[in-house]
């Protein structure tokens, strides 16, 4: 209503920042008296509805939505300015899962402070704009999550669901609480309401109706809150918390969810090493099983694109200087809510297990990836280096202490399970799969059409460096003598200079390859070789 300048700038921001998404713009003009009456003459390519009388906010929205032709309806206040690439993330999220009925944006004030990262509704019907006036870049505001509601300044709903619900409930005429009510209706109809932090919208707030709740249209905010409480009192009592109690759970609707904390050396670089791929796939599993998942990388660095991938998956990743310094405070504050802690690797787990035991009542799972003491013992047997034997003994004590301190220890190989039981029969240890496969595409092998050999391994792992050096110096000369045209491709992230220098016309050091490129190598090479002289655990390159 009126405020032409805001409406014009809002539409300008849509046109500039929406990418190649197909959309229509419907301007719902609620009987304005300013230049808005001529907006369709000023801005072309929009569909403008000029109400003959003032319908007020709620009925204006319901009336305009009848004209929408798209698969989704996005309600956007005229006192907003959308930011770069705001629209595609909303669509990508709602299309990810048929059970998602409505999605909403991260709202920020014009001065850059956060206005809302999803809303919280308490048992008494009162509401919080979660994160209000905080830094919008903090980790806790930047992962996909369920929300009690998203403020109606920027929400998108499936059109079919909107029509099934019947639009905004007119008991909340003229405005206020209709967005919260819509979110509850979405859940009543079996769907979820989700917050998408990658969609950022600046909201000026209060431009049309002001901010004084004692007079004017804004006064309906208080009246409608009472109506909202009356309508949803049973739902609020059963599935929401008392006012200001445990916002850690309330902010993401995890009142009835199990919360799991995963700890590893850094955010999993799932396309660069086997251990990271394992961690990533188990994170996916826990999210898909309905856990609320938190992740700490011991370096507290937001490696990209990996951190963004986890956040879009629904994992809250703790990173940055604050958490690097205060992770124990975070555990102390929220430990009562954490039901499970999944610790990875001995050199990382030893730093965290005492704090986990002190500040939480969580069941502790330790995943060793491999037995370090067994790997170093095997390297000693190969090289005769006495320092490795001492190191193996040191690792054995550390690893055994962790295994016995955990509620359950897992390894990817029955060999590790057996080795532990030989020295500690009382240990609770089991073998579990290193990788989780689903929807595996069938491949026509045609070995007669294939040629060449390949080796894949991340070179941050010492046995892989040794393997390639041994291959180059001991095996390749005999292989080339027998097959002069043979090609052996060495694949894997971060090959050191000592590996790069081994390259010949027969031994090709390719370094990092994408998953798609790796698939091509697997389909075109005749044999995948594993010239490891020592190691432990399951070799991802074999699986």
Where are the regions a protein language model picked out?
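Acidic donor-binding segment of Leloir-type glycosyltransferases
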Residues: 15-53
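Glycine-rich, basic loop-to-helix element that forms the pyrophosphate-binding segment
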Residues: 51-68
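Short aromatic/hydrophobic "clamp" motif used to bind/position activated sugar donors
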Residues: 73
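Conserved donor NDP-sugar-binding/catalytic core segment of glycosyltransferases
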Residues: 80-122
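A short, conserved alpha-helix in the catalytic core of glycosyltransferases
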Residues: 85-91, 142, 146-166, 171-202
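Short, flexible, basic/aromatic active-site loop/helix in glycosyltransferases
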Residues: 105, 110, 122-148, 163
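Conserved catalytic-core segment of nucleotide-activated headgroup transferases in glycan assembly
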Residues: 271, 275-280, 284, 295, ...
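Acidic donor-binding loop of glycosyltransferase active sites
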Residues: 338-339, 407, 523-538
């Amino acid at each position: 209503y009126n405020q032409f300048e805001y409406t014009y700038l809002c539409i300008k921001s849509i046109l500039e920042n929406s990418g190649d998404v197909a959309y229509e713009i419907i301007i719902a003009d609620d009987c304005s008296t300013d230049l808005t009456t001529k907006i369709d003459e000023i801005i072309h390519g929009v569909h403008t509805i000029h109400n003959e009388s003032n319908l007020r906010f709620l009925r204006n929205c319901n009336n305009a939505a009848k004209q929408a032709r798209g698969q989704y309806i996005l309600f956007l206040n005229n006192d907003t300015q959308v930011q770069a690439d705001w629209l595609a993330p909303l669509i990508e999220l709602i299309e990810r899962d048929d059970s998602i009925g409505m999605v909403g944006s991260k709202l920020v004030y014009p001065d850059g402070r956060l206005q809302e990262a999803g809303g919280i509704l308490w048992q008494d019907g009162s509401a919080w704009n979660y994160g209000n006036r905080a830094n919008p870049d903090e980790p806790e505001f930047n992962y996909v999550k369920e929300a009690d509601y998203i403020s109606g300044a920027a929400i998108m709903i499936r059109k079919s669901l909107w029509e099934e619900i019947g639009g905004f409930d007119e008991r909340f005429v003229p405005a206020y609480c209709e967005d919260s009510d819509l979110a509850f209706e979405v859940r009543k109809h079996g769907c979820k309401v989700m917050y998408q932090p990658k969609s950022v919208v600046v909201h000026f707030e209060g431009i049309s109706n002001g901010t004084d709740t004692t007079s004017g249209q804004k006064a309906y905010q208080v009246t409608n809150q009472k109506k909202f409480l009356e309508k949803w009192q049973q739902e609020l009592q059963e599935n929401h918390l008392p006012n200001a109690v445990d916002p850690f759970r309330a902010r993401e609707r995890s009142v009835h969810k199990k919360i799991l904390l995963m700890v590893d050396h850094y955010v999993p670089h799932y396309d660069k090493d086997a251990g990271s791929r394992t961690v990533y796939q188990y994170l996916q599993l826990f999210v898909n099983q309905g856990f609320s998942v938190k992740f700490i990388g011991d370096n507290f660095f937001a490696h990209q694109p990996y951190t963004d991938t986890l956040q879009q998956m629904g994992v809250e990743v703790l990173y940055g200087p604050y958490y690097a310094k205060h992770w124990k405070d975070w555990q102390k504050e929220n430990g009562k809510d954490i039901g499970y802690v999944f610790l990875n690797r001995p050199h990382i787990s030893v730093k965290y297990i005492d704090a986990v035991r002190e500040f939480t009542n969580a069941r502790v799972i330790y995943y060793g990836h491999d037995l370090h003491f067994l790997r170093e013992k095997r390297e000693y047997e190969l090289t005769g280096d006495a320092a490795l034997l001492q190191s193996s003994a040191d690792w054995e004590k550390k690893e055994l202490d962790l295994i016995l301190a955990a509620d359950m220890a897992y390894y990817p190989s029955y060999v590790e399970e057996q080795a532990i039981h030989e020295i500690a029969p009382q240990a609770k240890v089991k073998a579990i799969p290193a990788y989780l496969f689903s929807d595996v595409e069938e491949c026509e092998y045609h070995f007669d059409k294939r040629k060449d050999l390949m080796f894949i391994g991340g070179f941050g792992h010492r046995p892989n460096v040794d393997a390639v050096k041994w291959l180059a110096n001991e095996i390749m000369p005999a292989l080339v003598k027998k097959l002069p045209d043979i090609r052996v491709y060495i694949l894997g992230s971060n090959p050191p200079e000592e590996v790069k220098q081994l390259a010949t016309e027969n031994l090709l050091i390719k370094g990092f390859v994408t998953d798609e490129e790796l698939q091509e190598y697997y389909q075109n090479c005749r044999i995948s070789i594993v010239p490891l002289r020592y190691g432990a655990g399951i070799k991802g390159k074999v699986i």
